[in-house]
Regions:
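Extracytoplasmic soluble-region selector
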Residues: 24-110
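Short proline/glycine-enriched turn/loop motifs at strand-loop junctions of beta-rich domains
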Residues: 55-60, 218, 261, 282, ...
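Canonical leucine-rich repeat
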Residues: 169-172, 191-194, 210-213, 234-235, ...
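Bacterial N-terminal signal peptides that target proteins for export
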Residues: 2-12
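C-terminal motif of bacterial Sec signal peptides marking the signal peptidase cleavage site
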Residues: 19-22
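Concave beta-strand-loop units of leucine-rich repeat
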Residues: 149-165, 177-189, 199-210, 220, ...
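LRR flanking "cap" motifs
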Residues: 113-177
């Protein structure tokens, strides 16, 4: 029995000895023969020493070779970049009796090309793995030309992940076939490399820290959005004759010239430092947003297609609104307007509250549907020519004595906010019937306001 037990106990011991002896060789059993980096991008003249990811004995004999010696050279692991292009560097060795080969793809970039932020090429390949034609995990100059659209927008800047964040776009200049580039909410401070992308049709660089951007070498540019860049003080779009959309709100831009932009459809300059706005002979311009600037002077001429003008919260004392046959929305509230001449056949929505208007002629607005005219020193509001008026806001006007709603029509969905703060109101002229009932409910007997119906 004792002999049997001794035999059994000796088996594990023998296995340990066997396993230990099998690994007593120059290299560990699990040794991997590969480089730490599978691909490296260098500029001409730079050099790098290739390192192996696993343990390699100093006694191991390694032979080195390079596929294209005109692109890079290799000497005992030291790689030197010679000329632009892509090549493979090989290391060969026999380990534990097995011949092994390690490979590293070396890209020598053209002069001026370098990805300062490694997140940029990494993110591009995550979004567009199809351009990595040689499957080496790097972007060659030739592969960069395959990309025509690149969207690097961060949806929520406060929740941006590390891999989404890009601090430098150096290297983007290699992507010369790009027609669309979106860098919204990115963490860049310099957009200079983008200026080399001459085929861009759409460029969105918004809510970044860039101080400037030049787009005059982008003749195909149609849609430019630079809003939210608090450090930008100027932009020149005179050379961008195909431009149809320009959004530069929330910048420090104080002057903009769109004289040459005959294709312009939409312009947004909200919350800029503009002091004047001149828009002339722009046949396709459809809407203008110029809210909360410092504008004291505007000129609108030759704008046959414009439908919306918003110039609220500025310093305007007068505005010329002649020859705007398509205008439907006009908002000029919170300015210093004392007069307002209105001959706009298609105007439906008019916001003029918080100005200094003592009188207003609404008789040439046959399509007027909504009027907001609070807080103006008016004495009378006459809507007798405005047959489709439905919404009226005319409150907090202590000087107001009369409102004339008698126009032969009444909308059963009418909303008349005409009571609060109108301490001097004496009479309201209405059409008899439903409108009369509406107003008598609003101003019951004893209110001091006479409801005169016909």
């Amino acid at each position: 029995m004792n002999k049997i037990i001794k035999s059994i106990l000796s088996i594990p011991f023998a296995l340990v000895v066997l396993l230990t002896s099998s690994c007593l060789k120059p290299e560990p059993c699990n040794s991997k023969f590969q480089f730490e980096q599978e691909s490296i991008t260098l500029k001409r003249g730079e050099q790098v020493t290739l390192k192996f990811s696993g343990y390699i004995s100093k006694k191991t004999q390694i032979s080195w070779s390079v596929e294209k010696p005109n692109v890079a050279s290799v000497d005992n692991g030291l790689v030197r970049a010679l000329n632009a292009g892509t090549t493979n560097v090989y290391a060969e060795a026999t380990i534990n009796g097995i011949k092994k080969t390690a490979l590293c793809t070396i890209t020598v970039a053209p002069e001026g090309f370098r990805f300062t932020d490694p997140n940029l090429p990494k993110r591009i390949l995550q979004l567009h793995p199809e351009i990595d034609t040689n499957k080496d995990g790097a972007i060659t100059p030739e592969e960069a030309l395959l990309l025509t659209e690149l969207d690097l927008e961060i949806k929520d800047k406060a929740k941006a992940t590390a891999e989404e964040k890009i601090t430098s776009v150096e290297g983007i200049e290699l992507f010369t076939n790009l027609t669309y580039l979106n860098l919204k909410n990115q963490f860049i401070k310099d957009a200079t490399p983008v200026e080399a992308l001459k085929k861009l049709e759409k460029l969105y660089i918004t809510y970044t820290e860039i101080p400037s951007i030049q787009v005059k070498e982008m003749p195909e540019l149609r849609d430019l959005r630079l809003f939210g860049n608090k450090n930008i003080k100027e932009i020149d779009v005179r050379s961008n004759t195909k431009l149809d959309t320009l959004y530069i709100q929330d910048t420090q831009i104080s002057e903009i010239d769109v004289t040459n932009n005959k294709e312009l459809i939409a312009l947004n300059v909200n919350r800029t430092n503009l002091t004047r706005l001149i828009l002339a002979d722009l046949p396709k311009l459809n809407q203008v947003l110029a809210v909360k600037c410092q504008i004291s002077s505007v000129s609108f001429k030759g704008l046959p297609a414009i439908k919306k003008i918003y110039i609220d919260n500025n310093q305007l004392t007068r505005v010329n609104l002649k020859d705007l046959p398509a205008l439907m929305h006009l908002s000029v509230y919170n300015n210093k307007l004392q007069t307002l001449e209105l001959d706009l056949p298609k105007l439906m929505f008019l916001h003029t509250h918080e100005n200094e208007l003592k009188s207003i002629d609404l008789s040439k607005l046959p399509m007027l549907f909504h009027l907001d005219i609070d807080k103006n020193p008016l004495v009378k509001i006459d809507l007798s020519s405005n047959k489709i008026i439905r919404d009226l806001r005319s409150e907090y006007i202590p000087t107001l004595e009369e409102i004339n709603l008698r126009n032969g029509e009444y909308n059963e969905d009418a909303q008349y906010e005409i009571k609060e703060g109108n301490t001097g109101l004496k009479r309201v002229l209405v059409d008899s019937g439903d409108e009369e009932t509406h107003l008598r409910n609003l101003f019951p007997a004893g209110s001091g306001v006479a409801i005169l119906a016909e």
